[in-house]
């Protein structure tokens, strides 16, 4: 039987709509399980908050009751970020300003590009400075660092050593390449060591190409890189290892990344942070794993992160792409991201979460097909941006008001970060000051009113 083309189109549309609805419902069935949500909520409450007690006394030390205290959170200790790869590189000043606004409105953390191929495309000609020749997605680090300082953004360098995106001129013999890397490490540490205190030292070693000059079955270039870089950077610098999505999230019993990191730490390798990528560069790839693949079920994700947490090092989700392409893609993207961020935020040792490309059409190569930005290409926020804004600036930001008790104390529990405290007595502001509230501790502050 032949069907008119119009009926075939309608049928295709119905099937596509059904598939989208099925994904949304299936995702919720997996992630909205009450026991899982309760565990996530408990983790956030236990690991992301602290307690503060404000004690108000007069000049003689006598406690003052009925004093109004307002606590307003100003910053987060937890690092929420994205890469900063196209800062100032968009088509118009308006788009560049919208990019900055979309970034600073929700983020306090930025990944800066140190890919060797673009930092030193010609041997000896380093692209550190503002005047360096333009390369798309590779603004000079000096420019990015200056912007981070102005906007109180914590910078992170990525990466120092990777088997990919290297200049054509690098040596093909192992010892000569090690010497070239040593020089690279020294130059970067000398210029940025005091200002950039988090670095991905080794990237994606477990998928290293066998054609890479430093490759060996033992991957001994990994401890070598950490041992070379550790003396070059201040002790306060966090030196990280970073690994790809499907490798780093395997169940514990078969997780080669866990085995690698444990072995390196046991041998004394100075790894100080552990990074997990979370890239899905197409809708088909995302649907291959979500919501039913066991590796990316919420219970396995929590088990993997909790097992890595036993190593007592900070954990970071370092690179995230969740696609927004396809019918209903923007809604599905926001739905998935809300659940994933909540899970990540609940893990005790988790210290930061980095989205990858802030805007659509700014990704590397064909990775842009995923439409994995938080905004569209015109920098208009997508539902996923609003979902993160709600989490970071509303759900996970504390503001409270109350009065001191008969002992002159006002207590509150809030998300870790800095707070502005306003003290009002008899409708007159007496003091305003800032406090720092750490995670899982109690801050005791005494305020004296004349």
Regions found by a protein language model. Name each.
Residues 86-95, 117-122, 127-128, 132-139, ...:
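Acidic-and-aromatic substrate-binding clefts and catalytic sites of carbohydrate-active enzymes
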Residues 29-30, 191, 200-218, 225-228, ...:
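Aromatic-rich peripheral "rim/lid" segments of glycoside hydrolase catalytic domains that contact
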Residues 109-125, 138-246:
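Substrate-binding cleft and catalytic face of glycoside hydrolase catalytic domains
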Residues 105-117, 185, 192-207, 237-245, ...:
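Aromatic- and acid-rich polysaccharide-binding/catalytic face
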Residues 20-65, 70-88, 121-125, 156, ...:
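Beta-strand-rich domain onsets/edges
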Residues 90-101, 139-143, 183-188, 216-229, ...:
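Alpha-helical scaffolding within the catalytic cores
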């Amino acid at each position: 039987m032949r069907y008119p083309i119009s009926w075939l189109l309608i049928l295709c549309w119905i099937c596509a709509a059904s598939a989208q609805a099925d994904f949304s419902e299936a995702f919720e069935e997996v992630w909205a399980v009450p026991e899982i949500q309760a565990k996530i909520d408990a983790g956030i409450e236990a690991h992301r908050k602290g307690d503060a007690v404000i004690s108000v006394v007069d000049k003689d030390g006598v406690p003052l009751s009925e004093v109004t205290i307002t606590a307003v959170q100003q910053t987060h200790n937890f690092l929420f970020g994205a890469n900063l790869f196209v800062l100032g590189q968009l088509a118009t000043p308006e788009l560049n300003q919208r990019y900055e606004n979309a970034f600073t409105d929700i983020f306090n953390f930025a990944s800066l590009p140190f890919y060797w191929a673009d930092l030193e495309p010609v041997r000896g000609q380093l692209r550190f400075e503002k005047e360096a020749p333009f390369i798309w997605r590779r603004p000079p680090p000096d420019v990015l660092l200056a912007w981070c300082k102005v906007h109180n953004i914590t910078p992170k360098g990525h990466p120092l050593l990777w088997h990919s995106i290297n200049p054509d001129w690098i040596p093909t013999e192992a010892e000569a390449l090690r010497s070239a890397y040593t020089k690279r490490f020294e130059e970067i540490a000398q210029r940025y060591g005091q200002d950039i205190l988090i670095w991905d030292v080794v990237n994606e070693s477990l998928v290293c190409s066998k054609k890479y000059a430093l490759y060996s079955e033992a991957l001994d270039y990994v401890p070598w890189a950490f041992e070379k870089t550790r003396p070059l950077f201040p002790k306060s610098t966090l030196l990280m290892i970073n690994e790809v999505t499907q490798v780093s999230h395997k169940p514990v019993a078969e997780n080669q990344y866990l085995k690698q990191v444990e072995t390196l730490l046991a041998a004394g390798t100075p790894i100080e942070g552990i990074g997990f990528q979370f890239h899905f560069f197409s809708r088909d790839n995302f649907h291959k794993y979500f919501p039913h693949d066991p590796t990316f079920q919420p219970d396995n994700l929590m088990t993997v992160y909790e097992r890595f947490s036993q190593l007592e090092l900070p954990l970071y989700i370092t690179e995230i792409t969740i696609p927004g392409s396809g019918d209903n893609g923007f809604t599905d993207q926001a739905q998935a991201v809300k659940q994933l961020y909540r899970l990540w935020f609940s893990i005790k040792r988790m210290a930061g979460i980095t989205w990858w490309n802030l805007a659509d059409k700014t990704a590397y190569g064909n990775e842009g097909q995923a439409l994995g930005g938080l905004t569209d290409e015109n920098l208009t926020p997508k539902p996923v941006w609003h979902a993160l804004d709600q989490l970071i600036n509303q759900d996970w930001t504390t503001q409270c008001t109350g009065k001191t008790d008969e002992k002159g104390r006002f207590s509150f529990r809030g998300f870790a970060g800095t707070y502005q405290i306003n003290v009002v007595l008899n409708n007159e502001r007496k003091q305003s000051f800032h406090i720092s509230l750490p995670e899982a501790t109690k801050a005791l502050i005494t305020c004296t009113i004349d």
